[in-house]
């Protein structure tokens, strides 16, 4: 890419929509490769301000190709992408580097909880070495479409801080309101929730988060799609760079605190209220045994 464009990109971490034209190439050990024009922008939240930055590659018609058509990940059965992410390791890049891919890799394919595929790569930008990165899927409506083989047009993706990543927050707010205003100890209320939430998926997600003692909880994401699983809510595991730091932390108390998680008070409404139900508690304990 133009060196001045890259310099401007690096110097403006607070410019969330700042995107520049680039050309991406991947060369694999088996000799296969792709080369494609794309857009590049900084990726992440606070990690945008770190020395080793993460990047999103955007495949758009304005750059010459509307999609990347290439089998990037051997454990995925699709080969069309609107975007990919080059993750630096974020807060873990000066430590283990592998926390995020380790945790999501342990869960991948073992439960219905979605995680990003990854491929370790060595990154060069304009011929300069930038270190070891993880090439990953980008979590958006196209990711849900690829993973669940459904149209992306009716996808809602909501972060635990209420940021809408795709679609609308309306049905998510309705879910939280129902949980807060109806006693989940009553079986008829829990039976209704089972029609709009995949409770095993939610249990598996929070069990994994508890095992990993992931304190950077803001990137918790829930999703639903009208064409998948009767539009029930599911979870996505993402951003585990802070996993396995504070292993003595009482994470169960943390994730069920009525005041919310961290100083920001991120909602514990879903898990906390589900645990009021005897059937869900039995499922939760059963899934702990399965996952361990």
Predicted features and spans:
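Regulatory N- and C-terminal appendages and interdomain linkers associated
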Residues: 1-46
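Active-site acidic catalytic loop and adjacent metal/ATP-binding pocket
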Residues: 57, 197-252
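ATP-dependent phospho-/nucleotidyl transfer catalytic cores
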Residues: 70-91, 95, 128-130, 134-214, ...
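C-terminal catalytic region of ATP-dependent kinase domains
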Residues: 229-292
């Amino acid at each position: 890419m133009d060196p001045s464009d890259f310099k401007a990109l690096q110097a403006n971490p607070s410019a969330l929509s700042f995107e520049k034209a680039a050309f991406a190439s991947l060369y694999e050990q088996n000799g296969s490769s792709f080369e494609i024009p794309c857009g590049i922008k900084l990726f992440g939240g606070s990690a945008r301000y770190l020395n080793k930055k993460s990047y999103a590659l955007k495949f758009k018609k304005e750059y010459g190709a509307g999609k990347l058509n290439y089998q990037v990940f051997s454990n995925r059965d699709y080969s069309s992408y609107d975007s990919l992410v080059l993750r630096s390791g974020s807060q873990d890049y000066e430590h283990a580097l592998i926390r995020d891919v380790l945790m999501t890799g342990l869960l991948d394919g073992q439960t219905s909880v979605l995680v990003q595929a990854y491929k370790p790569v060595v990154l060069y930008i304009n011929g300069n070495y930038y270190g070891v990165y993880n090439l990953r899927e980008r979590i958006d409506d196209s990711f849900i479409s690829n993973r669940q083989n459904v149209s992306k047009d009716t996808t809602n993706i909501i972060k635990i801080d209420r940021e809408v990543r795709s679609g609308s927050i309306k049905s998510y707010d309705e879910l939280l309101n129902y949980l807060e205003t109806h006693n989940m100890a009553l079986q008829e209320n829990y039976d209704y929730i089972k029609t709009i939430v995949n409770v095993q998926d939610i249990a598996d997600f929070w069990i994994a988060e508890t095992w990993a003692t992931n304190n950077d909880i803001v990137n918790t994401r829930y999703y639903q799609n009208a064409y998948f699983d009767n539009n029930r809510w599911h979870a996505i595991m993402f951003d585990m760079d802070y996993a396995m730091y504070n292993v003595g932390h009482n994470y169960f108390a943390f994730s069920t605190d009525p005041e919310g998680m961290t100083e920001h008070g991120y909602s514990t409404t879903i898990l906390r209220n589900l645990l009021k139900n005897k059937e869900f508690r039995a499922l939760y304990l059963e899934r702990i045994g399965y996952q361990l």
